[in-house]
């Protein structure tokens, strides 16, 4: 079987299983199986697919058809033009979270705290894009292992701390606190795609029945590690409800994404 034929058959299997973006997914999985990029696939379309490549490709196709996210199969996800390692222990970084990174970069903070770092995508990106001192926390030891791996692989200097929110950190030591907390409402669970609902870590997705449980803790807790005049930035689910929680903060603003959806809340510590 040639590379071209394998790619076509993979696409057809994925389409039959109603997997979205079947062609792209087949390409990504075949690239993973053979260890070459997309340009190689098309330059060597008439090459015979060796047996070990076909075995790997077949296994990856089966995993995807069974609902495993492509990113967990390949172990990779691009974020802010860099490739991050991801596993089922961490949430898959989304493109919309780059709006949070952009908002943080615009502040030029000297010391940044990322609460609930997960894969480390936000913290590592901020460390690489700035000269800031970056600290990141997470309660999950498995997530911290992935985050440390990503920092090391990408050459970022980030201090990782195992704790709940910012509990283990010194008061008033940061100019900026960023967070992408779990904000999917438990009542909306059934509306999620199965590959998200059933495969990504629930603790990183769901913020209680109304999606606001972590915000209720995070908004008051973020005051402590922030210096006076420091900034809190959070990715949003329910913008109106979270804005109301920040009534005691100054300079509250909402940043919309390109689709006009409220995506980031910014608030200044008095």
PLM feature spans:
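Conserved SAM/SAH cofactor-binding pocket of Class I
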Residues: 92-191, 217, 239
């Amino acid at each position: 079987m040639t590379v071209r034929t394998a790619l076509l058959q993979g696409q057809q299997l994925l389409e039959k299983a109603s997997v979205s973006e079947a062609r792209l997914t087949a390409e990504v999985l075949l690239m993973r199986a053979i260890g070459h990029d997309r340009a190689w696939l098309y330059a060597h379309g008439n090459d015979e697919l060796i047996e070990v490549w076909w075995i790997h490709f077949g296994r990856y196709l089966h995993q995807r058809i069974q609902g495993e996210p492509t990113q967990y199969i390949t172990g990779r996800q691009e974020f802010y033009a860099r490739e991050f390692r991801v596993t089922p222990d961490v949430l898959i970084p989304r493109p919309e979270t780059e709006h949070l990174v952009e908002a943080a970069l615009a502040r030029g903070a000297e010391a940044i705290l990322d609460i609930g770092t997960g894969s480390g995508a936000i913290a590592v990106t901020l460390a690489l894009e700035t000269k800031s001192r970056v600290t990141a926390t997470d309660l999950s030891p498995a997530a911290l292992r992935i985050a440390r791996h990503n920092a090391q692989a990408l050459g970022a200097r980030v201090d990782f701390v195992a704790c709940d929110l910012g509990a283990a950190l010194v008061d008033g030591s940061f100019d900026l606190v960023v967070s992408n907390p779990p904000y999917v409402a438990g009542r909306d669970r059934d509306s999620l795609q199965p590959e998200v609902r059933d495969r990504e870590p629930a603790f990183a997705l769901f913020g209680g029945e109304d999606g606001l449980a972590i915000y209720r803790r995070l908004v008051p807790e973020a005051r402590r590690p922030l210096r006076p005049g420091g900034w809190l930035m959070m990715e949003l689910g329910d913008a109106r409800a979270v804005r109301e929680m920040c009534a005691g903060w100054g300079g509250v603003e909402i940043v919309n994404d390109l689709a006009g959806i409220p995506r980031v809340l910014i608030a200044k510590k008095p």
